[in-house]
């Protein structure tokens, strides 16, 4: 049975009753004109076609379950999805600019060729698939304990990808023009970055404390700097990365980093480092800075030209060149990094 309503006839109470009817399998809102549309929590296991809905703000209530189709919609600017949403969302070729998901959502999200640049914030414990291709975003941010599969490919925007604490999912980045990628504390997920253009791409990746995951950056052709927080024990592959210049670890690194055949210039690890560094055939390597306790495992075929020391570190110099100023860090850099991470986690939506 099909039933048709005009915009004036489809009141909030009628929409509520419509979704409470479990015989309702699909709702299509063509030329539905309202400033704001609220999808009630009574929406259960139905499809909602809003491709031609003329509303500027869409609110999906918590605990609802629906397949939401916003493809080609040129009117919705803001989308807010409540906690514990189940289903799917497709906003390909739409003009949405702000998307915010609540906590505990389990849904698949797709966007192929966005109409406008957008910002997306995913709440805590998000799971599902996030697939964004050939689109422009200003910021994508996930919350705590995300275990989704995130695919970002051939996107642009020159902004940030911020992954929240305790990430347990997979992040695949392919040819994304973003300024920075930040990974939160206690990451145990899998991350891969690939680029096809050395002039455009991600320049800097910042990984917070407690990293125990896997990250493959061998094909990150524009990457220049990787910074890893304290107590990291994961695996980082930078073998053959031509653009990498500096890799820095805070205290107690016990993981493995493979830099063979890369363009790395400067490697630094702080106190308590017991990790393994593979530095074979690194022709540009200029300075290796390691703590005095000599617990690190270093694989390198070149002999340093000189070795300096201070109260806490050994400095292995492999040439006479001075380290570029942009690769060294002032003593307060780690505090600034922690402050920036705190602000992004708690204040930037």
Name each model-derived stretch.
Residues 333-349:
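Short hydrophobic helices that act as membrane-entry/anchoring signals
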């Amino acid at each position: 049975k099909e039933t048709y309503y005009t915009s004036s006839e489809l009141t909030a109470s009628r929409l509520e009753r419509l979704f409470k009817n479990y015989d309702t399998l699909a709702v299509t809102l063509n030329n539905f004109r309202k400033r704001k549309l609220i999808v009630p929590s009574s929406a259960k296991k139905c499809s909602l076609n809003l491709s031609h809905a003329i509303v500027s703000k869409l609110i999906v209530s918590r605990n609802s379950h629906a397949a939401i189709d916003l493809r080609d919609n040129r009117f919705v600017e803001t989308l807010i999805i409540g906690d514990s949403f189940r289903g799917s969302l497709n906003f390909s070729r739409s003009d949405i600019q702000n998307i915010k998901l609540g906590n505990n959502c389990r849904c698949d999200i797709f966007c192929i060729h966005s109409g406008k640049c957008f910002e997306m914030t995913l709440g805590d414990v998000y799971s599902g698939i996030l697939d964004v291709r050939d689109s422009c975003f200003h910021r994508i941010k996930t919350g705590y304990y995300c275990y989704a599969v995130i695919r970002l490919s051939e996107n642009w925007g020159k902004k940030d990808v911020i992954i929240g604490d305790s990430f347990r999912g997979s992040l695949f980045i392919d040819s994304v023009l973003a300024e920075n990628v930040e990974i939160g504390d206690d990451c145990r997920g899998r991350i891969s970055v690939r680029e096809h253009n050395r002039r455009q791409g991600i320049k800097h990746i910042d990984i917070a404390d407690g990293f125990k995951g896997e990250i493959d950056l061998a094909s990150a052709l524009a990457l220049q700097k990787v910074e890893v927080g304290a107590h990291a024990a994961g695996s980082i592959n930078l073998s053959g990365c031509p653009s990498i210049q500096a890799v820095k670890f805070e205290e107690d690194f016990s993981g493995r980093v493979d830099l063979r055949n890369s363009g790395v210039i400067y490697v630094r690890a702080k106190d308590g480092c017991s990790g393994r560094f593979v530095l074979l055939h690194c022709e540009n390597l200029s300075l290796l800075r390691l703590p005095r306790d000599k617990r690190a495992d270093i694989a390198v075929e070149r002999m340093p030209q000189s070795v300096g020391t201070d109260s806490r570190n050994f400095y292995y110099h492999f040439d006479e060149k001075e380290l570029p100023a942009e690769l060294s860090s002032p003593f307060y850099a780690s505090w600034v990094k922690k402050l920036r991470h705190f602000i992004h986690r708690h204040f930037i939506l």
